[in-house]
């Protein structure tokens, strides 16, 4: 059995870690380096940093904090936001990131996924998918979600895009379930199940974790990793206790 991963997500805006609810009303959560160090020391398996404003504002991610994070932690980390070229990705990887994740830029230029996979290997290339469930239950891919003013439907359905990014060379998919984001009432298991069924690469669930049982429910579907933010930032769930709980439930977890 492959070891399941517990991942903390740090949304970055204007050099600080922030957190919103359903991708809106972001509140300050603290210093990037301090939080990265805290997670590294407290048993998290991996970190994902989303510069939530970079794509929307057409800015580059600051290489300075990426480099500082790399010096201060000893766990893998992934960086996302405004990565539009092989040059952008190369710089972030050179500054210490283990993986890069693309979202809106991949929707604008799907060939970017293939170019990055060829240049750096599929193991480095994560595709983030912001999936919104409408009132009829249709799953739609949104883009530029870092800012309410720019957030919009990309024209693609979630399941179509999941298939497409795999064909293009994505090494991993993070499914951000927008309706669940920050509300702490559990991952959307129905949506996760539908995506997992067509996923041939590692799948990470994001959006909705509120208690330990929510992680267990998601992992029971077969997914590879569960990502959370609010419950970890607010210390509502202790990472080490979560891992012991999951291990006691029979999952393969790194303690």
Curated annotation (Swiss-Prot):
Its EC number is 4.3.2.10. The active site is at 11, 130. It is found in: Cytoplasm. InterPro entries: Aldolase_TIM (IPR013785), His_biosynth (IPR006062), HisF (IPR004651), IGPS_HisA/HisF (IPR050064), RibuloseP-bd_barrel (IPR011060). The keyword Lyase applies. This is Imidazole glycerol phosphate synthase subunit HisF. GO terms for biological process: L-histidine biosynthetic process. It comes from Campylobacter jejuni subsp. jejuni serotype O:6 (strain 81116 / NCTC 11828). Pathway: Amino-acid biosynthesis; L-histidine biosynthesis; L-histidine from 5-phospho-alpha-D-ribose 1-diphosphate: step 5/9. Keywords: Amino-acid biosynthesis, Cytoplasm, Histidine biosynthesis, Lyase. One of its GO terms (cellular component) is cytoplasm.
């Amino acid at each position: 059995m492959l070891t399941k991963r517990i991942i903390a997500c740090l949304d970055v805006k204007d050099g600080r870690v922030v957190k919103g609810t359903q991708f809106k009303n972001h509140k300050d959560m603290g210093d990037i380096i301090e939080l990265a160090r805290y997670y590294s020391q407290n048993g998290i398996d991996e970190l994902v940093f989303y510069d939530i404003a970079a794509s929307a504002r057409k800015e580059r991610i600051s290489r300075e904090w990426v480099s500082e994070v790399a010096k201060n932690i000893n766990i893998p980390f992934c960086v996302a936001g405004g990565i539009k070229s092989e040059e952008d990705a190369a710089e972030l990887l050179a500054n210490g990131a283990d993986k890069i994740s693309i979202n809106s830029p991949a929707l604008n230029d799907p060939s970017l996924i293939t170019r990055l996979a060829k240049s750096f290997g599929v193991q480095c290339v994560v595709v983030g998918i912001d999936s919104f469930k409408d009132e009829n239950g249709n799953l739609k891919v949104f883009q530029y979600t870092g800012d309410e003013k720019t957030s919009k439907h990309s024209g693609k359905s979630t399941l179509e895009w999941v298939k497409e990014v795999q064909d293009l060379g994505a090494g991993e998919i993070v499914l951000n379930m927008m309706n669940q984001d920050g509300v702490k009432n559990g991952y959307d298991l129905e949506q996760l199940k539908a995506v997992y069924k067509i996923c041939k690469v590692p799948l990470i669930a994001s959006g909705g974790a509120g208690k330990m049982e929510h992680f267990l429910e998601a992992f029971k579907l077969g997914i590879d990793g569960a990502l959370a933010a609010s419950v970890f930032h607010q210390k509502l769930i202790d990472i080490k206790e979560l891992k012991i709980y999951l291990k006691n439930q029979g999952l393969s977890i790194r303690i």
